[in-house]
């Protein structure tokens, strides 16, 4: 009889090809995910920060001099989709600050260091817009965290 661990591994390996599709097809599939919406008390805007498009989640009440710079995950090849927006909106509401989500250039169309250049441009743009470095909290998930660490090393 197989162990529980080997049964789990066999199950996971049998599903390994779920993401083995062309990137364009995966992107289209993600667009079809039904959004849960953003919480009340948060609005969403699009802004160009230093030439890079960003989704900005704005809490109805909060601090105007502090912000979160949040880099979404997605293997550097998937854009901002509903779960990212919803998470950023909840962060904005809970923390009471704007959350900036750069729509950084994606691979493979834009190879490294394109995403890093966009991340740095948004950070520098936030400084130019009056945020002090000490009032910007950087966050990320999955590959977004890798992008964040790369940006910190580049500073």
Segments the model singles out, each with a brief description of its role:
Residues 65-74:
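Short beta-strand element of the alpha/beta-hydrolase
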